[in-house]
Amino acid sequence: MSGAATTEGAVTRFDAALVGTEARDWFALLKPRVISLVVFTGAAGLAMAPGPINPLIAAVSILCICMASGAAGAINMWYDRDIDAVMTRTARRPIPDGRIRDDQALGFGIGLSVASVLLMWLAANALAAFILAFSIFFYAVIYTMWLKRSTPQNIVIGGAAGAFPPMIGWAATTGSLGVLPVVMFAIVFLWTPPHFWSLSLYACKDYGRAGIPMLPVVRGARHTRWQILFYTLILSAVSLVPSFLHQAGWLYTGVASLLDAGFVACAVGVLTDRQDEAGVSLTGDRPARRAFRYSLAYLFLLFCGLLADHFLIMR
C-alpha cells in the first residue's frame, strides 16, 4: 500500500515538473527579456501623459502591451525557426529544440495578437489599439519576414517596431498623441542600432552562418564601429530634446547628459578597440560587449530619469 502511494506521489511530482517545464517553454516563446523593456517604455509613456490616469485602464493597457510584445515574439520565433536552429545563441529556443511545434507557436502568436488588440480597443481606445496592431505587424511581418533577411539596415528600419510602446501608452490614456511620446519614440528608435550592432559585432560569425545580413557581416566590423558611434552621437542629441522643448527639467537634463557621456565613451571604446586589418577585434570584443550591456542600462535609466523629473520637478 505504501509502495503504491510512493509511486503515485512520484508520478504526481513528475507530472507537475513536466507541466512546469512546458510552461517555461511557452514563456520563453514570448521573449520575456524583450517584453520587460517594451512594457517599461510603454508604462513610461502612459505615466508621462497629461491628465488623470484611470488605474484600471492603465493596468489593462500595460497588460495589452505585454501580450502584444509576446505575440510578436512568438511569431518571430516561428518564422525564424530555420535560422535559430543554426545559430549558437538561439539553437536552444523552444521551436528549433523541438519542445514546441511550429504550428502551435504560430497559432499562439496570432491568437495572442488578436486578443491584445481587441482588449486594448475595448479597455482604452481605437488609436491605442491601432498603434498596437501596427507595431505587431511591423515587427512580425515587415521586420521579421522582410527586412531581417534582406538588408543590413534591418535594425535601423525595424527598430521602429520596438519604439512604439511609449506612443501606445500615451494614446491609451489620452486618446491622442503629443510631442513628447514622439520624442520618446525617436529615442528608442535611435537607441536600437548601437544596441544591436554592439551585439552583432561579437555574434558576427553566428549571423553569418545563418545568412542574416547584419551590418558587420555585409559591411565589415570597422564600418559597423563607426556607425555605432554615429548613431550614439545622434541619440545623445535627441535625448536632450525633451529639455529644449520644456517637457523635462534639470533633473532629466543632468541624468541624460551623464548617461549620454557614458554611452559615447562606450562607442569610442568600440571604435578604438584593438583590431586586425579587417577591423576584427583582438580583445574578444570586450568593448562591444560592454557597450551592449551599457545600452540596456542606458535606456532604463534614461526613462527613469524622465519619470523622476516629471513627478518630482515638473509637477
Swiss-Prot record:
Bilayer topology: Multi-pass membrane protein
Reactions this protein catalyses: heme b + (2E,6E)-farnesyl diphosphate + H2O = Fe(II)-heme o + diphosphate
One BP term from GO: heme O biosynthetic process
GO molecular function, one term: protoheme IX farnesyltransferase activity
Matching Pfam families: UbiA
One cellular component (GO) term of this entry: plasma membrane
Entries under Gene3D superfamilies matching the protein: UbiA prenyltransferase
Its EC number(s): 2.5.1.141
Cell inner membrane found in the keyword field: yes
Regions that span the bilayer: 34-54, 55-75, 105-125, 127-147, 155-175, 177-197, 226-246, 251-271, 294-314
Pathway where it operates: Porphyrin-containing compound metabolism; heme O biosynthesis; heme O from protoheme: step 1/1
Compartment annotation: Cell inner membrane
InterPro entries documented for this protein: Protohaem_IX_farnesylTrfase, UbiA_prenyltransferase, UbiA_prenylTrfase_CS, UbiA_sf
Keywords: Cell inner membrane, Cell membrane, Heme biosynthesis, Membrane, Transferase, Transmembrane, Transmembrane helix
Disulfide linkage: none
Additional remarks: Carbon 2 of the heme B porphyrin ring is defined according to the Fischer nomenclature.
Role according to the record: Converts heme B (protoheme IX) to heme O by substitution of the vinyl group on carbon 2 of heme B porphyrin ring with a hydroxyethyl farnesyl side group.
Family to which the UniProt record says this protein belongs: Belongs to the UbiA prenyltransferase family. Protoheme IX farnesyltransferase subfamily.
Protein name in UniProt: Protoheme IX farnesyltransferase
Name of the gene this protein is made from: ctaB
